Design a protein with these regions (language model features):
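Non-catalytic connector elements of ABC transporters
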Residues: 239, 249-370
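ABC ATPase nucleotide-binding domains
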Residues: 74-80, 84-231
Length: 370
């Protein structure tokens, strides 16, 4: 079955000046829904094209189902490819698009007909078999593209931003349909996206990429709850970032980070030294907020500068007493609302604070999405 191994793969363009994939190694397990996630230009689509055989690596090896495929053409790799732009034949109806692969492979007509019907019933479009692509909605066209990719019998499905051209509500519905389909058919899927909500909802595991490199691989919960890299804390979910120094290292894996103007926060963790400059990250939804100024351990005073009602949540923009700005998100059902200009106390739970070495090029550069 099609597990995929990428071993020390590098790909550069412009005579080596642009390194799109930089010494990447990955192991995608059999029957796994795996996503490559990152901002535009991070190398995720290039890596997918390398796995597909559409381009060749400069260095490294790619294995599909235990077979080295560096020199194997795309049509012999046993893959199905789904593009953001659907890539349907505009002059063919839905039926001919879906059964194109079996016909090219010269399968028996009975088998091609059976597969075509099964695939279209699976994506709930058998009744539109005689429609041409321009008569279909975007969601329908993507389901046709998926059926076509599966009709040739591929067990490895490669999806390049498959939901990117669809509107928000259709994306939400189709991503669950897509995962269910992959799991029901026991496929291996590699899904490229820049949408972290899409990746976390649909994936068994995710590789977060930036500037051609894989920063962290893990399931959605691991990446959210335990980011190993500062950019992962930024790109998966949302985080507030504050600068400081380690002012004290205590026993029991505790230390103190001193923020601007000497404001202390106790943090859990290890591996940091007194005097070290660090950046801390904390999720807006992990912060606590109370009315008035009540000095408690791991709390800072602040003033509400902005309030945004977002349905299930309320988003507060707060200026802390040292001038730093943060965001606090609280469930609207708590019915504990705060107004702009109100003085508040913000609690920072020690176990919810992530600490990272301060980036050499600065925080802004390290968190940039380009």
């Amino acid at each position: 079955m099609p597990e995929v191994k990428v071993m020390n793969v590098t790909k550069a363009f412009a005579k080596g000046k642009i390194v799109a994939v930089d010494n990447v190694s990955l192991h995608i397990r059999d029957k796994e829904y795996f996503s490559l996630l990152g901002p535009s230009g991070c190398g995720k689509t290039t890596l997918l094209r390398l796995i597909a055989g559409l381009i060749q690596p400069d260095e490294g090896e790619i294995y599909i189902g235990g077979r080295l495929v560096n020199d194997v053409p795309p049509e012999d790799r046993g893959i199905g490819f789904v593009f953001q732009t659907y890539a349907l034949f505009p002059h063919m109806d839905v039926w001919d698009n879906v059964t194109y692969g079996p016909r090219v492979k010269a399968w028996e007509e009975d088998k091609s007909t059976r597969i075509g019907r099964e695939m279209l019933e699976m994506v709930r479009l058998y009744e539109r078999a005689d429609a041409v692509p321009h008569e279909l909605s975007g969601g329908m066209m993507q389901r046709v593209a998926l059926a076509r990719a599966l009709a040739a019998g591929a067990k490895l499905l490669l999806l390049d931003e498959p939901l990117g051209a669809l509107d928000a509500k259709i994306r939400l519905t189709l991503r669950y349909d897509l995962r269910k389909l992959v799991k029901d058919l026991e496929l291996t899927a590699i899904h490229v996206t820049h949408d972290q909500a899409e990746a976390t909802a649909i994936s068994d595991r995710i590789a977060v990429m930036r500037k051609g490199r894989v920063l962290q691989v893990g399931n959605p919960q691991e990446l959210y709850m335990n980011p190993k890299h500062i950019f992962v804390a930024h790109f998966i979910g949302e985080s507030n970032f504050l600068e400081g120094y380690v002012s004290e290292v205590r026993e029991k894996k505790e230390f103190v980070v001193e923020l601007r103007q000497g404001l202390p926060l106790q943090v859990l963790g290890k591996g940091h030294k007194t005097g070290e400059k660090v950046a801390i990250a904390v999720r807006p939804e992990a912060l606590e907020i109370k009315k008035g100024k009540v000095r408690k351990p791991n709390s800072l005073f602040g003033e509400v500068e902005g309030v945004q009602f977002e349905g299930t949540d309320i988003r507060y923009e707060i200026k802390l007493e040292n001038g730093d700005h943060i965001v606090v998100v609280r469930p609207s059902l708590l019915m504990e609302w705060f107004s702009a200009g109100e003085k508040v106390t913000v609690g920072f739970p020690a176990e919810k604070i992530f600490v990272f070495p301060y980036p050499l090029k600065g925080l802004r550069e390290e968190l940039a999405l380009e």
